[in-house]
Amino acid sequence: MEFPFDVDALFPERITVLDQHLRPPARRPGTTTPARVDLQQQIMTIIDELGKASAKAQNLSAPITSASRMQSNRHVVYILKDSSARPAGKGAIIGFIKVGYKKLFVLDDREAHNEVEPLCILDFYIHESVQRHGHGRELFQYMLQKERVEPHQLAIDRPSQKLLKFLNKHYNLETTVPQVNNFVIFEGFFAHQHRPPAPSLRATRHSRAAAVDPTPAAPARKLPPKRAEGDIKPYSSSDREFLKVAVEPPWPLNRAPRRATPPAHPPPRSSSLGNSPERGPLRPFVPEQELLRSLRLCPPHPTARLLLAADPGGSPAQRRRTRGTPPGLVAQSCCYSRHGGVNSSSPNTGNQDSKQGEQETKNRSASEEQALSQDGSGEKPMHTAPPQAPAPPAQSWTVGGDILNARFIRNLQERRSTRPW
């Protein structure tokens, strides 16, 4: 490959090694600084043209080797020139090979993943006019000696069929290890330990300081033992104790504030797994008898007394209080009941109280008649007012008082004979 400038003046050696800085070789005596800047521009032109020729030979859509990529990556290029051919005394370029270290994940013979950082063949090109003349072997062998590696320790990026035949012919590399990426490795790749890339100057300083400093390293921190997977449960009973919320009982049992106390023993797994982690097991409700007893103990409101005096059998409180009474007493408490005479069929205490009430009423009426006969001359008047019952005693809201028994209901029925229908 020919160029319009002098290649021999640019590359004094047959094989020239260039890194990412693209600096020209040692300056010849008598060269000036502007001339050196022009030499670097010429090197960039050579690399760009070699990359285009390689992409065309491999049928690639874009070149993979260029001066800009060389400056942004830590790759090395080996350039081979033809010193014998001197067209117009300027020399020519035969080919090049680009290598670099890359971190790869490759599979071994047992299909196990391995993280390695081998030296990779990234691009290799020899001009078509000088192929099969030993130039490729010469360039490849020089690179192996310079990098101090063996052919089977290399990883090749997207090799062409010509390159695979070249390696099989000169280095007996035929059996490959299948990979999931675009790199190809050969049998024996894992037989030797790969040489890591050249350490930087900063890493070398740190390594030297560590070798000189006799301070012992800090002991490694011990990690807690890992729990066995068999002990792990999705929702364990012990982990959910703090999530349980006490269920508030119904009114009126929720007057006194209650604090939710955690249970002494966690519930069994059968009962705990049936509930949500945010809700605990529901508490049983209070029986109806206890609820009615608590209602009787509650002091009434003053307006309830007036309502009871106006409508003794129709107030909701009276209906709640007589819910547990026998049917006979319930019928007697209603104004429209037809069971007014039922007072001796039931042997309970309600019927006994009703009998005592009737007897006291008769005694009161007899005493009033005697008092009227003693007043005046002793003759009965023609028109006398009907005897009025004395004012009932003051109603007392006490447990077991007259207001809750059948006698009080009977007295109310005698004073009020009006029927709702």
Curated annotation (Swiss-Prot):
The record marks 58 as: Crucial for catalytic activity. It catalyses: L-lysyl-[alpha-tubulin] + acetyl-CoA = N(6)-acetyl-L-lysyl-[alpha-tubulin] + CoA + H(+). One of its GO terms (molecular function) is L-lysine N-acetyltransferase activity, acting on acetyl phosphate as donor. Changing residue 106 to A: Reduced activity. Residues 196-235, 252-284, 306-402 are annotated as: Disordered. This is Alpha-tubulin N-acetyltransferase 1. The modification N6-acetyllysine is found at residues 56, 146, 233, 244. Changing residue 120 to A/S: Strong reduction in microtubule acetylation. One of its GO terms (cellular component) is axon. One of its GO terms (biological process) is positive regulation of NLRP3 inflammasome complex assembly. Specifically acetylates 'Lys-40' in alpha-tubulin on the lumenal side of microtubules. Promotes microtubule destabilization and accelerates microtubule dynamics; this activity may be independent of acetylation activity. Acetylates alpha-tubulin with a slow enzymatic rate, due to a catalytic site that is not optimized for acetyl transfer. Enters the microtubule through each end and diffuses quickly throughout the lumen of microtubules. Residues 226-235, 355-367 have a biased composition (Basic and acidic residues). Changing residue 105 to A: Reduced activity. Autoacetylation strongly increases tubulin acetylation. Its main location: cytoplasm. The modification Asymmetric dimethylarginine is found at residue 305. Acetyl-CoA binds at residues 124-137, 160-169. The modification Omega-N-methylarginine is found at residue 323. Residues 1-190 form the N-acetyltransferase domain.
